[in-house]
Amino acid sequence: MRAIISLFLISAMVFSMIQAVPEEEGLQLSEDERGGCLPHNRFCNALSGPRCCSGLKCKELSIWDSRCLG
């Protein structure tokens, strides 16, 4: 009985550690995107999303393609 409880607790700890890693990485990526700007000729979103660096504007080239251009 003790072995089953120990195995259950270890499994729960491993599962929680595996589940926590992608969430932390996702938060880190979104913070980096919000803080930075996009350089010339990078994909952007005119309505939301990362902003282009100063002097550049997000221009819609087609329905599926918007880029930071001067």
From Swiss-Prot:
Gene Ontology terms, MF aspect: toxin activity
Compartment annotation: Secreted
Keyword list, A-Z: Amidation, Disulfide bond, Knottin, Neurotoxin, Secreted, Signal, Toxin
GO cellular component, one term: extracellular region
Principal place of residence: secreted
Pfam families: Toxin_7
Propeptide residues according to the Swiss-Prot or TrEMBL record: 21-34
UniProt miscellaneous comment: The primary structure of the mature peptide is identical to that of U2-agatoxin-Aop1a (Agelenin) from Allagelena opulenta (AC P31328).
Protein name listed in UniProt: U2-agatoxin-Ao1a
Species this protein is from: Agelena orientalis (Funnel-web spider)
